[in-house]
Amino acid sequence: MLSTILYLSIMWLCGWFMLWNIRTLSDKTPYEPHSVSVIIPARNEEANLKNLLPTLSNQSMKLQEVIVVNDDSDDRTEEVAREFGVTVVKPERLPIDWLGKPWACWNGAKHATGSLLLFLDADLEIERDGIERLCGEWERNRGMISVQPFHQMKSAREKLSSLFNIIVMAAMQCFTLFRKKPAGAFGPCLMIDRKTYTEIGGHEGIKHQVLEHMEMGRVAMNQDVNVTCFSGYKAVYFRMYSEGLTVLFFGWCKSFALGSAKTPLLPLVLTVAWITGGISLAIQLPFLLVQEINEVLMWGIFYLLFAIQIKTLMKKIGTNSILSALSHPFHFLFFSLVYIWSFILSMIKKEVKWKGREISVSEKGDA
């Protein structure tokens, strides 16, 4: 019994070590005015643009421009963008050695006129002072500012994403107890000044990378550019995989198939240990009916400790109710299923399908 207590204690502590301090955007505004060009790569994003663009038109600071890059959409993406009065860019046919999102971002950057470039995914929503706070952080830190949006989850089904959001934050390794440099940059929201963007090669330098901004962050740090990562808590939001359980399952399978090989060793060890502890709890629960009271009490205490931990960690990451935290055994088992299938995608099939395009999964991320 003592060995089990020690084992579960170590696994539980790993959860705190992997997300010791999650940095959020400061409320401090910039000292100087900045011209910001917002660039939105959009492939079949008609519905999402209707949510994002109104939040951009209502910002506390005046934007230089908003550019929507139509990445070969077959819905009303372009029409919706024009209805909101933003600039629409339609790139030439996708070159054979480029992936879609880097190509869209690169073309948007070429048309931009601002001194700061802000790349946003179409499924985001920004608080009224969100971009001003991003500018403030860029002014204080320089280089590249990267934000993982706060995940708004409304249904119980959507809250199955909780563990995945925790792992995504932990994988960046800059929020661990050891405060290491970021593993790269988050994909959905990235701000960089034009001069630095040009010097590091922009999206042309990572044109074949599936996780383009993760790789761009690495390229930037290799050239001694500062990369600072934040949670989007109370500033930048998104809502993913609200369409149903199937979309949620395969969406996270795709993300983990593409990202697992890029995770540094330290956060990988911490997250594997933590997940292992959670799965151990989930597997053990049915057997508590036939165990002695001391065993039941021990497992019950760790069940509550994991629930409290998940609720605490999720505060700055995404929506999470007490009921959702208490149902963590189902979350850990669901995570296991997704991880197994993502392993099959990455190691056996070696490709995933996303927005109608087949994407090869390889060490270099080549398409």
Regions found by a protein language model. Give the residues of each.
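N-terminal membrane-anchoring/stem segments of glycan-assembly enzymes
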Residues: 1-32, 175, 335
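Short aromatic/hydrophobic "clamp" motif used to bind/position activated sugar donors
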Residues: 105, 117
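Acidic donor-binding/catalytic loop of UDP-sugar-dependent glycosyltransferases
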Residues: 76, 122-137
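Membrane-embedded multi-pass helical conduit in multi-pass membrane proteins
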Residues: 273-349
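Catalytic donor/gating beta->alpha subdomain of glycosyltransferases that bind UDP-sugars
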Residues: 138, 144-146, 150-156, 161-169, ...
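A conserved acidic beta->alpha catalytic loop
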Residues: 62, 70-78, 93, 124
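Cell-envelope/extracellular polymer assembly enzymes that use nucleotide-activated donors
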Residues: 34-37, 65
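Short, acidic, metal-binding catalytic loop of nucleotide-sugar glycosyltransferases
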Residues: 54-63
